[in-house]
Amino acid sequence: MSDTPTRREFLLTASMAALVSQHVAGQSTAVQPFRFQRIETNGVTLRCAIEGTGPLVIMVHGFPELWYSWRHQIRPVADAGFRVVAPDVRGYGESDKPHPVAAYDMVSLTGDIVGLIDALGEDQAILVGHDWGAPICWNTAALHPERIAAVAGLSVPFFQRGPAPSLENWRNLYGNGFFYQLYFETEGVAEAAFEADVRTALRKLYYTISGDGEHAPLHSLSAPEPVDDVVGTMVDPDPFPSWLTEPDLDYFTAAFEQGGFRGPLNRYRAQGRDWELLPQLSRLQVHQPSTFIAGALDPVRTFVPGVDLYAGAGANCTDFRGSTIIDGKGHWIQQEAPLLSLVLNPPRHAH
């Protein structure tokens, strides 16, 4: 794959197009039209949805999701002349689920992406990541710059390694109050809460941090006091907003009923290892063409009270093409919003 500036700009445009959907609210994309392949990478096997031919675009989901979160974007980008690969991240869906917390550190997860590129016979890929998929993509671009042509992060901007581990920072910030990542830290607690009724837990979480859940309890994923019954505190909407259909929820539910939540939750628990193993991330930047896309009502934006974490999204990206913040939308941006304008040009800034 050529690495000329013109080519790289074209690839960035394609990564923006990866977010574009002709999705009509209330419609669901059937699973069966997509082609699936199990690919060995970095000591694990990942189940991937694969469509199209051409330059490689890898779409990386977050918590608690699946390849299916990209169901509205896979085919439009493949039809535009790209080879789109959307894996179930390790720990999820039909991919391998190692038991140890250490198997979910950022070294392992970025290694999975590089291994996918190798296994698919490519030199480079465009990366598009959402939620935890965004740090996986940002960090792969920073750690392996020669392998990544462009990167788009959704929901979570690129943050360099801080002076202390993330969970320590959250503990200092929230004290005795509730913050979801601290709740996830103790093995078995969140697993029991979510696995008691997977469908209800997913339904409540998907609603709570969406744009529709702006005023719902725990929309910020934090509270000034401890919260003992997290799932019980969240609202169960009736009806659910049209961006997630009952068949969509069926698909997510079946996957998590079968695979559980330990692997996905282990990603949060492995953050201390990231800090220990990757000190170079305190200075590395993302030099590839890059952009950031999020919903204006995404709770990630206000994780640090009084600070807009999206304001400096490109601070450590040397070829940053701007942020696109979508009014009225929340955390599940590629499912909540059709981003039709992005197919035309790489964004500078839009609201």
Where are each of the predicted segments found?
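N-terminal secretory signal peptides and thylakoid transit peptides that target proteins
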Residues: 2-17
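Conserved HGGG/HGGXW glycine-rich cap/lid loop of the alpha/beta-hydrolase fold
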Residues: 50-96
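Active-site helix-initiating loop/hinge in glycosyltransferases
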Residues: 62, 105, 336-337
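Catalytic active-site module of serine/aspartate enzymes centered on a nucleophile-bearing elbow/loop
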Residues: 318-351
